[in-house]
Curated annotation (Swiss-Prot):
Record keyword tRNA processing present: no
List of residues that carry Pyrrolidone carboxylic acid: Q47
Signal peptide extent: 1-22
Tissue specificity note: Expressed by the venom duct.
Family, similarity comment: Belongs to the conotoxin O1 superfamily.
Keyword Secreted: yes
Protein keywords: Disulfide bond, Knottin, Neurotoxin, Pyrrolidone carboxylic acid, Secreted, Signal, Toxin
InterPro entries referenced in this protein's UniProt entry, alphabetically: Conotoxin, Conotoxin_omega-typ_CS
Comment block on domains: The presence of a 'disulfide through disulfide knot' structurally defines this protein as a knottin.
GO molecular function (one): toxin activity
UniProt name for this protein: Conotoxin ArMKLT2-031
Amino acid sequence: MKLTCVLIIAVLFLTACQLTTGETYSRGEQKDHALRSTDKNSKLTRQCSPNGGSCSRHYHCCSLWCNKDSGVCVATSYP
């Protein structure tokens, strides 16, 4: 019985904490956090190599076609 009461109180407390945190972020205080997240993601993105650029894998090329024998990105041509 005591354990059940403790668990119920803990769940209510955690729910209240989440609700107050959600209200804080909805007032616009999350703006700086979102900018930091965007800056971090932009640093992680990689640039692709244009046609004629060097490559070792197909995903290094903007066209997604890499001639692995010569190590050069090639243009795609569909009939």
